[in-house]
Structures are given as structure tokens and as C-alpha cells.
Regions:
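Heptad-repeat coiled-coil alpha-helices
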Residues: 1-38, 45, 172-189
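Extended alpha-helical scaffold/assembly modules in large eukaryotic proteins
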Residues: 39-189
Length: 189
């Protein structure tokens, strides 16, 4: 190979290297943006976790003991039941809460990433828009229900941000794959 060919090959390699670096920087920017958004959402998730961590078995027993629960308790338990995949009626709620330990574990182990968009949209529309649906009002009627109200609102807020992060994570994975492939080709040269 003469000098002219070597120079031409080197120019191509340098050009490809610049393209790889540009794509890597673009991927890093997407990653930074996704991480930034996730950090903004994290306090909401922490708030949701803290709300259910405060609940104890006796709190669930208190909720379950209502034969005719205050409307604020019903208004809170219905979306909790929907979110957990149960029927929203009070009879079902009492049945689910009959094993307080299991119910608490279900709340504490709830994975917000599996939240169904249709369900949370329904909850937002049917419950969150009510003036009385706030932790203070609900908590004045039942402290455990107030904590669950906080949990619901915080999970909803987290989910709003999280669903916007998912496309960024998909885009990032695609960009990283392209970068790795381009880098492998470049390394062969």
C-alpha cells in the first residue's frame, strides 16, 4: 500500500471516528436527560414509599373495621383496589384487607413501572379531580386512608414522569447499540 492509499484510509478512519464520537455524545446527552428526569421523579416515589412504610397492621385493621366507612375512606380505597387489580367495592376491599400483613406487603411491593396507563387515567379522572381527594381531608377522617391517599397521588406523579422516560431509555439503548456496532467496525480498521 502506498502513502496515498494509507492517507486515504486514515482519512476515512478519522471521519468514521468523528461520527462514532458524535453518536456517543448524542447517546450520552439522552442518557443524561433521562437520568435528570428520573432524579426529578424520585422524590415522588420516595414519598409514596414513605406513606406506606408508616402503615402498620393495626392501621389496616382500623380501615377494615368500618362497616359503613366515611365517604373519604371509600373514595380512597376504591382507587387503591383498582390499582392493585381488584374490584373497587367495599366488600372486596375488606376481603383484601382481611390479611393485613399480605395487604401491606402488596402495597409496599407495588411496582409503579407495571402500572397500567388505562387504570391510572381512570383513577385520575374519577378520583383525583374531586376536591375532597387530598391527604389532609382524607387523613382527618382516617389516618391510614390519608396515608393511602398520599401514596396514590405520589405514585401517579411518579408514573407521569416515568412514562416520559421510557421512550428516552429505548432511544438510548438503540443509540448505544449503533455506537457499539460502529466502534466495532472502526476497531477492525
Amino acid at each position: 500500500m502506498d502513502k496515498l492509499e494509507a492517507d486515504a484510509k486514515e482519512a476515512v478512519v478519522l471521519q468514521e471516528k468523528e461520527v462514532v464520537e458524535k453518536r456517543t455524545n448524542e447517546a450520552k446527552a439522552v442518557q443524561d436527560e433521562a437520568e435528570h428526569d428520573l432524579k426529578l421523579a424520585q422524590p415522588e416515589l420516595d414519598k409514596a414509599i414513605a406513606a406506606v412504610q408508616k402503615l402498620e397492621k393495626n392501621d389496616i385493621v382500623e380501615l377494615k373495621s368500618f362497616t359503613a366507612p366515611p365517604p373519604a375512606v371509600v373514595m380512597t380505597m376504591e382507587p387503591v383496589m383498582l390499582l392493585l387489580g381488584h374490584s373497587k367495592d367495599w366488600k372486596t376491599a375488606k376481603s383484601v384487607m382481611s390479611d393485613a400483613t399480605k395487604f401491606l406487603a402488596e402495597l409496599k411491593g407495588y411496582d409503579v413501572k407495571t402500572m397500567k396507563e388505562k387504570t391510572i387515567q381512570q383513577i385520575r379522572k374519577d378520583y383525583f379531580k374531586k376536591a375532597d381527594f387530598n391527604p389532609s381531608y382524607v387523613g382527618d377522617r382516617s389516618k391510614p386512608a390519608g396515608a393511602l391517599c398520599t401514596w396514590l397521588l405520589a405514585l401517579s406523579n411518579y408514573q407521569t414522569v416515568y412514562k416520559n422516560i421510557v421512550p428516552k431509555q429505548v432511544k438510548l439503548a438503540e443509540m448505544q447499540a449503533v455506537c457499539q456496532e460502529a466502534q466495532a467496525v472502526l476497531d477492525e480498521k
